[in-house]
Curated annotation (Swiss-Prot):
GO terms for cellular component: cytoplasm. Modulates RecA activity. Belongs to the RecX family. This is Regulatory protein RecX. The lineage of its organism: Bacteria, Bacillati, Bacillota, Bacilli, Lactobacillales. Its main location: cytoplasm. It is found in: Cytoplasm. GO terms for biological process: regulation of DNA repair. It comes from Leuconostoc mesenteroides subsp. mesenteroides (strain ATCC 8293 / DSM 20343 / BCRC 11652 / CCM 1803 / JCM 6124 / NCDO 523 / NBRC 100496 / NCIMB 8023 / NCTC 12954 / NRRL B-1118 / 37Y). Keywords: Cytoplasm. It comes from the Bacteria. The gene is recX.
Length: 267
């Protein structure tokens, strides 16, 4: 048996030094001090000392986890990663996670549902990217599917359409075909299915864009026509046409514009 001969406050708030038989033995959190009723003069056997140290390890790990959770919601995997960074053993991590789960500090399904809800509003994402994000965060497939069930087809179309309108502005000088391809790709990158992207593109890019298409192809054709002005006529026409093909313009429109350029050149 060893006797507590001194209890002193550490510089770190909420921590105490325990001296046994006039020698420093270990430090404990205030919660552990209270839980075990540690006081000067109390005698401790080796088994009790081991139990006190184990409880203090849990208290320190719990403090790390709660501080991490105080900033935002996190998954079990993320909390464990944070404790691992602080060199907390896996067995202690499991005990801490069990306490946190019981006290509802962590809940992967709640995290997933909150994440889905947030990604409808802030930095919007589609279901595919959200699913990857949640998997990376350690959420299981069942919880992911449950959370994503709150992301309706109508909401996906509404959010994707807003993103598509922004992309349409970015690609306004592109050919209709190129514009559609780039918008679909942008939406796919954001996590929306190609089915959703196609529906949205058909809404955003309408037949009313014909005038814009004509303006764009004329602008591009004139640039290419000037660029190849030193070529022989046949090569000038060929290279200008090829440039327009690669930008996604259709053959009929290209021929019309090239004809206009040829007429202008003859004049």
């Amino acid at each position: 048996m060893k006797k507590i001969t001194k209890i002193s406050i550490q510089k770190k708030a909420g921590r105490y030094n325990i001296d046994l038989d006039n020698q420093f033995a270990f430090g404990v959190a205030e919660s552990v001090l209270i839980k075990f009723g540690l006081a000067k003069g109390r005698e401790l056997d080796d088994e009790l000392i081991a139990e006190i140290k184990h409880n203090d390890s849990i208290a320190k790990a719990l403090s790390i986890a709660l501080n991490f959770l105080s900033h935002s919601l996190h998954t079990v995997k993320q909390v464990k990663q944070k404790m691992s960074e602080k060199e907390v053993s896996e067995s202690i991590q499991d005990e801490v996670v069990a306490q946190l789960y019981e006290q509802k500090y962590i809940d992967d399904l709640n995290y997933a549902q909150h994440y889905v809800s947030t990604k409808k509003i802030i930095s919007p994402k589609g279901p595919n990217v959200i699913k990857m994000d949640l998997k990376q965060a350690g959420v299981n497939d069942d919880d992911i599917e449950t959370a994503l069930s709150d992301y309706t087809h109508e909401e996906q179309i509404e959010i994707a359409e807003k993103l598509a309108l922004k992309s349409a502005t970015t690609y306004k000088r592109e050919s209709t075909r190129a514009k559609k391809q780039k918008i679909v790709q942008a939406l796919a990158t954001k996590g929306f299915s190609f089915d959703i992207a196609e529906i949205v593109v058909d809404r955003v890019i309408t037949e009313n864009d014909d005038e814009i298409e004509l303006e764009n192809i004329k602008r591009q054709a004139e640039k290419s026509w000037r660029r190849y002005r030193n070529e022989v006529p046949s090569q000038r026409i060929y290279k200008t046409k090829n440039s327009l093909y690669t930008k996604g313009y259709n053959a009929e429109l290209i021929n019309v514009v090239i004809h206009e350029l040829e007429v202008s050149a003859d004049d």
